[in-house]
Amino acid sequence: MANKSTYAYLGPVGTFTELALAQVKDAKNASKLPVSTIQEAIDAVLSKKAFRAIIPVENSIEGGVSATLDALANTKGIRIFGEYLVPVTFNLVAKPGMKLSDVKVISTHPTAYAQCRGWLQENLPKHSQIPATSTAQAALALLEKDSYADAAIAAKSITDHYKLTVLAKNIGDNKNAQTRFIEIGLADVPTKRSGKDKTSIIVELPDDRPGGLLEMLEQFAARGVN
């Protein structure tokens, strides 16, 4: 039986996924299990190391998270139990004493980097980038002695967890960006209807031809399904 007191999320502490987890009422007093990848989060649920997992499914700027969508399509035995929206606000952080003019190398998750590209080109046009597994991991790595990065792009809450200095606030190119997260668990766990339930489906068309997608979508319209 899955441990109902454990929730898996993409860590380490300070990620946007952790902010989504903070919205889950049933997880307020639960143990948090940080993992490195979406697949690890799903595996934690399947192996019953975690009761539920919080993973990103869609970003308003970058679109769907392919790793999550592929996992939902190919993994049997899991279902979605909830969704949570997290506003995406990025800060540029560094170790105390670092100045913005001294920044040459920036580390962050590729998705975060893409959403701050305009600001970076305008304010740090000669910088280079080091990709990280998460924005929080990029920030945490700054505190290591052999860190190659001078600064990191991370969630504004990152300074609540690590001793870092904010060099620039709200550097995202789209100030209204948000990421949608889903809460997944084993499909054999019954739940009551909430009256606000949503159904997600994955469709594979039998052939590739003009109008195929339209014909499929017309089935929803004909039956009054939004």
Where are these regions (language model features)?
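Domain-level signature for soluble enzymes in the chorismate/prephenate branch of the shikimate pathway
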Residues: 1-226
